[in-house]
């Protein structure tokens, strides 16, 4: 290669044969299409276990081994050293279910080595979150908000938002409730506390004994309950200025915001007509 003074090599894995001469190999290495060995797509609003399942589906790693790695304190310690502004002692709070919950950014990740190590796969997702945190660093500082709290707020917005929802208004409801010392009463935190996925939270579920249960505890939960897209990050740091303290989702996905319990109850009576409709923000 040095003899041929070649350059412009493509990264990736290539299949070469013994019959190829130097010119043929150089041509292969410089002109071959850049095709990834595999890709992993992580959608918004996914919990760590769901992401582990996604990674397992595209690799030879089992979901169990992936979760073990994600919860491994030595691995987390290395991440803290490499990403000190993102991974802090906040993730080691004794009340947190999984330290890296919410820290694996939703995106499509391309990997060109079929033998990519699990650490590298996870770190690719952490790095994306770190870059986003750097982008919003000034806004977080202006709001005196840690990255961990910003991620937590963003995760609540992500889990509550529908396609038609105004995330900035949902954000304002959460901030208004916190300022009034009202519990957030957001259903996704109850489901996270229970470790369940279902369409409707029952009254008995609201009694879940967990620091994540925002019906029983005021303020934010101990940490994120899922990952969040950038739109939810942005909404978490830029809530609309409103007086809303309630909201509910109609069956068609439209979100109705109200300022008083009386208005909220009227909206419930008008729009929540059967058990398939899901009440929010009460």
What would you call each of these model-derived segments?
Residues 28, 54, 69, 124, ...:
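Generic alpha-helical secondary-structure signal
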Residues 61-71:
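Extended intrinsically disordered, low-complexity coil regions enriched in Ser, Thr, Gly, Ala
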Residues 1-28, 95:
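Extracytoplasmic/periplasmic/luminal assembly and interaction segments
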Residues 5-15, 34-36, 104-105, 244-254:
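Surface-exposed aromatic
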Residues 41, 59-61, 75-282:
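Bacterial extracytoplasmic/cell-wall-associated proteins, especially those involved in peptidoglycan
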Residues 12, 53-57, 64:
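Surface-exposed, secretory/extracytoplasmic low-complexity segments enriched in Ser/Thr/Asn/Gly/Pro
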Residues 1, 70-76:
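Short, glycine/proline-biased beta-turn/loop segments that scaffold the active-site neighborhood
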Residues 18-37, 43-58:
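Membrane-embedded segments
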């Amino acid at each position: 290669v040095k003899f041929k003074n070649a350059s412009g090599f493509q990264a990736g894995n290539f299949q070469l044969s013994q019959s190829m001469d130097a010119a043929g190999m150089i041509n292969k290495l410089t002109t071959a299409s850049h095709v990834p060995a595999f890709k992993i797509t992580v959608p918004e609003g996914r919990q760590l276990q769901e992401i582990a399942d996604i990674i397992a589906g595209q690799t030879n790693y089992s979901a169990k081994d992936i979760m073990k790695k994600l919860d491994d304190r030595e691995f987390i310690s290395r991440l803290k050293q490499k990403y000190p502004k993102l991974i802090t002692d906040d993730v080691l709070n004794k009340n947190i279910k999984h330290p890296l919950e919410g820290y694996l950014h939703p995106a499509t990740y391309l990997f060109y080595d079929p033998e990519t190590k699990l650490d590298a796969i996870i770190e690719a997702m952490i790095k994306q979150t770190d870059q986003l945190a750097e982008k919003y660093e000034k806004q977080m500082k202006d709001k005196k908000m840690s990255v961990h709290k910003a991620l937590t707020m963003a995760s609540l917005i992500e889990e509550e938002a529908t396609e038609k929802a105004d995330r900035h208004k949902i954000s304002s409801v959460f901030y208004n409730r916190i300022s009034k010392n009202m519990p957030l009463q957001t259903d996704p935190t109850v489901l996270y506390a229970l470790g369940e996925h279902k369409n409707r939270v029952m009254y008995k579920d609201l009694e879940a004994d967990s620091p994540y249960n925002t019906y029983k505890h005021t303020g934010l939960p101990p940490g994120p309950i899922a990952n969040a897209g950038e739109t939810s990050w942005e909404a978490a740091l830029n809530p609309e200025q409103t007086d809303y303290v309630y909201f509910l989702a109609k069956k068609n996905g439209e979100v109705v915001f109200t300022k008083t319990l009386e208005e909220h109850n009227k909206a419930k009576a008008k729009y929540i007509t059967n058990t398939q409709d899901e009440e929010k923000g009460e």
